[in-house]
Amino acid sequence: MTQNISFIVHLPGKPEAREELYSSLIKVLDEMSNEPDFVNTYLHRSADDPDTLVLYETWACSAQYFMEHHLKKPYRVNYEGKLKGLLKSERTFEWLDLVKGYERKDK
């Protein structure tokens, strides 16, 4: 059984690049959701800063494999190339260690 990884990505966008950041990211998310290692992702907008997008992602691979392979996929090249110009500060990854999981119980 493959161990899943989960992480949070913070994308603090420039106010003038809000729509471009969002539309560029959606294209990447649409493509990455077809990857065999992909489990899920949830895109959020920060309640404190509407220019900041936050992703919660889960993948069925190691963190090292994700960084070495998934960030270099052809469909990400354009996005990764222009990302720095869309952000007011650097993108950050927050890696998570699962402590315990809960799922809704059907009644």
Show where each model-derived region lies:
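Residue-level signal for secondary-structure boundary sites
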Residues: 17-19, 63-65, 101
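Short, surface-exposed ligand-recognition loops at beta-strand->loop->(often short) alpha-helix junctions
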Residues: 12-22
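Small-side-chain structural scaffolding
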Residues: 6-9, 13, 28, 100-101
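Alpha-helical structural elements of signaling/regulatory helical domains
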Residues: 16-17, 47, 75
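Glycine-rich beta-strand-turn "strand-cap" elements at beta-sheet edges
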Residues: 2-5, 42-51, 80-107
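An amphipathic, aromatic/His-enriched active-site/gating alpha helix that lines ligand/cofactor pockets
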Residues: 27, 33-39, 58-94
